[in-house]
Amino acid sequence: MMGINERKGFDFEYYQRNLLLQEKGFPTPKATSTGTTIVGVIAKDCIVLGADTRATAGPIIADKNCKKLHLISPNIWCAGAGTAADTEFVTSMISSNIELHSLYTNRKPRVVTALTMLKQHLFRYQGHIGAYLVLGGYDCKGPHLFTIAAHGSSDKLPYVALGSGSLAAISVLETKYQPDLERHEAMELVKEAIEAGIFNDLGSGSNCDLVVIDEEKATPYRGYSKPNERATKQSKYTYDRGTTAVLKEDIYKFVTVQDLDEMQVDV
């Protein structure tokens, strides 16, 4: 039997408290956000997902090597943009549910199954879960690539880009994407799109991570590209003789001898 003070469901008391504190001028805490550029491309016989590795908290870089590619199942991966905690926990929860579904049905999970679970969960919260996802995988029906917005809407496209750097990334994809790309071509295209977001968006930065999903397995590439790698500062720089080419040589005599007339002195 439930006690008198026992509550079920949502409790909105803290919501009213937060509004009152905000009206009195107290600053609201900022969630860690993955400013982000995430990209997905369907290739000839695989799916390639990519993401940068910068996480921000307002104007501050909170993490330089954040992991934005999440494992849903061995044949399904997800790239996340938005609030870092939301993307982490939503993908972790769906990964657990997909594993239970796979054990119950005794077969390899479908990509649309993960898509449906994510859409239903996000729609239930009407966008208050800040997770914007690129879902990619390879199942019995072939390769699939979807985008999922925080409100629960989705799209199925051959190439996608999400996040604050998506405008720069999608310009690269629209220019260079072709159907039936080879594996290495798709990887280089995704890398170039991510780097476009890194160099043209302050919320994206650091390294480029990739994952390639084919019919047999998924292969992640952590730190596939490091366009902003910082070198160790040396105390003394030395260069080999001949490093700098000599373009022109002029020789000047700084010591000159001049003959002068003897000075006459009146006595």
Swiss-Prot record:
Where in or outside the cell is it found?
Answer: Cytoplasm; Nucleus
Q: Which reactions are catalysed by this chain?
A: Cleavage of peptide bonds with very broad specificity
One GO BP on record is: proteasome-mediated ubiquitin-dependent protein catabolic process
Into which family does the record put it?
Belongs to the peptidase T1B family.
Query: Which PROSITE patterns is this protein grouped with?
Result: PROTEASOME_BETA_1, PROTEASOME_BETA_2
Q: Note the coiled coil stretches, chain numbering.
A: none
* Gene3D superfamilies, A to Z: Glutamine Phosphoribosylpyrophosphate, subunit 1, domain 1
Q: What does this protein do?
A: The proteasome is a multicatalytic proteinase complex which is characterized by its ability to cleave peptides with Arg, Phe, Tyr, Leu, and Glu adjacent to the leaving group at neutral or slightly basic pH. The proteasome has an ATP-dependent proteolytic activity (Potential).
Any single GO molecular-function term of the entry would be: endopeptidase activity
Enzyme class comes to hydrolase
User: Does the record's keyword annotation contain Glycoprotein?
Assistant: no
Q: Write out the transmembrane intervals.
A: none
Question: What positions belong to the pro-peptide in this record?
Answer: 1-35
Q: Which domain of life is it from?
A: Eukaryota
- Family annotation (InterPro entries): Ntn_hydrolases_N (IPR029055), Proteasome_bsu_C (IPR024689), Proteasome_bsu_CS (IPR016050), Proteasome_sua/b (IPR001353), Proteasome_suB-type (IPR023333)
Q: Which UniProt keywords apply?
A: Cytoplasm, Hydrolase, Nucleus, Protease, Proteasome, Threonine protease, Zymogen
What does the subunit section of this Swiss-Prot or TrEMBL entry state? The 26S proteasome consists of a 20S proteasome core and two 19S regulatory subunits. The 20S proteasome core is composed of 28 subunits that are arranged in four stacked rings, resulting in a barrel-shaped structure. The two end rings are each formed by seven alpha subunits, and the two central rings are each formed by seven beta subunits. The catalytic chamber with the active sites is on the inside of the barrel.
Gene that produces this protein:
pup1
* Active-site residues annotated for this sequence: T36 (nucleophile)
What's this protein's name? Probable proteasome subunit beta type-2
SUPFAM superfamilies, per the entry:
N-terminal nucleophile aminohydrolases (Ntn hydrolases)
Q: Which Pfam families match?
A: Pr_beta_C, Proteasome
EC number(s): the record gives: 3.4.25.1
Q: Gene Ontology cellular component?
A: cytosol; nuclear envelope; nucleus; proteasome core complex, beta-subunit complex
Keyword Cytoplasm listed: yes
